[in-house]
Each structure stands twice: as structure tokens, then as C-alpha cells.
């Protein structure tokens, strides 16, 4: 029923005859396409990985240039963390007027979207995905389109711990990326 609900929100007819992984991929393409229309004015073509990177950069680079003076490179989560650290302080201290506060809320929403996008590995459903992977994607779609999450069953995790690594106790908390 989750995929059907998402399809209905997209104003589609539910398509339960389509193979499950193909159906999930089609919904994923539609969701990124909607965001591309919102931010670029049109849906893009090409590999999903490139489209996601393009949208993430469209969301983050203008804000990085504004708040840090230049675009950053590297993993999305540290970039998002740095932007939030730049956007929030004056809001919290009440140093912005209503118009600036509204603008910054929009910027925080854009940063959140970039982080959401980065949580979707582009090849996650390739090559006969496990039931767990399929469930993870469907649950993520549900959460990202409705802000609600239902429990759909139990998940299993296997945690393998490798050899210990030496870490300096003098960690630089202002570093842009985690040195590990």
C-alpha cells in the first residue's frame, strides 16, 4: 500500500502489475524529476548519480559561496553541517528580521533536501537487491514524501568490527571533515 499511496500523491494510477524494483525506480526518477523542475525549471536527463550530484550542488554551492566565500567539495553531510553552523547562529540570537528569518528557513530546507538526497545511494537497487534494501528505499520514500514512517516489519543488521585504529586525542572540532 505504501507505493500505491505515493503513486496516488504523484497523481498516478497505481501500477501493481509492474515488477517491484522497476516500480520503485520509476517512483525515484519521478521524485528527483519533481525536484529538478522545482530548482532547474525542468527535469534533467542522464545517469541518476549525475542528476543527484547536480541537484545537490545546485542546493549547496550558492549557500556555500554566500556563507563561506567559495563552493566546497567533498561529502555532503559535512558540507551540510558547516552550512547549518553558518545559517543558524544569527537566527537563534534573534539578529535577523522576519524577511531574513524566512529566507534562512528556506535555506535550511534546501540544505535538508541535499542531505536527504545524499542518503539515497544511486545504485542501491542494482543487481537483485535484498528484501531489506527494497524495504529501506520504500520506507525512505514514504518518510520523504509524507513525513511519516510506519513499521513494515523487522530489519536485520550485521555489524562487523575490523581492527582498531589509532586516533589522536587532539581532534580538531573545527575541521571540515572527520579525519577518519
Sequence positions of predicted segments:
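Membrane-interfacial terminal anchoring regions of lipid-handling membrane enzymes
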Residues: 1-180
